[in-house]
Amino acid sequence: MNHIELINLIKNNCKTAAQEKYIGRLEKKFSIRSKRTLGTLEDLYSSLLVNKQHQLLIETLPYFLTIKFEGNYNHWYCIEHILEDIYFAILAMGGNEVLENQIFCHYKTVYDFINKDGSSNRYAIDLEWNNSHQAINKFNDEIRSCEEDKDVLYETSVRASLSREVVSIILLCKIKSLEFDDSLLELANEQLEILTNAKYKRYI
């Protein structure tokens, strides 16, 4: 699957005005190395997940499996977020060991690289923080702050990010052979359900 096939697949299955807007941006200019493209893809994939387009998300996995980590985590984390959305969709569809392992192997390749040499320690620290229960608590604090400030755009982003954080924790638990707390999945599903509210329609 190339990027044109990816765009056409999603375009033919758009459900919302926001999705059509994101696809329009990608049709105008698409570069998987561009922060603008990656940001639009992240927004689009959040929308697909909130709208329960799980099968569509899964069908796009082959494209993202072709993208290899090249040592720049500042670029890679956006791809990681998209893979986390797809992983969450797989779980929502009842799970698929083969597909879950494909994403896990991609994730572990990056984890192993980050932790293999001292020069990447700052990324290792970031990864440990971003995949912790403390991070979930931090996100909840941010949501409260967004509600107080009435910042709907940022609130949408924070709520959508919770599902990605939960998948990160699942994958990190697999790497470290730790037990995963299933209540975190319930928390993520609650946030995705909240995002179906009309308040967030402009972005979802």
Question: Model-predicted segments: where are they?
Answer:
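N-terminal alpha-helical interaction modules that lie
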Residues: 1-41
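Boundary/linker segments of alpha-helical solenoid repeat arrays
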Residues: 69-77, 111-124, 152, 195-202
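Extended alpha-helical scaffolding segments
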Residues: 154-190, 197
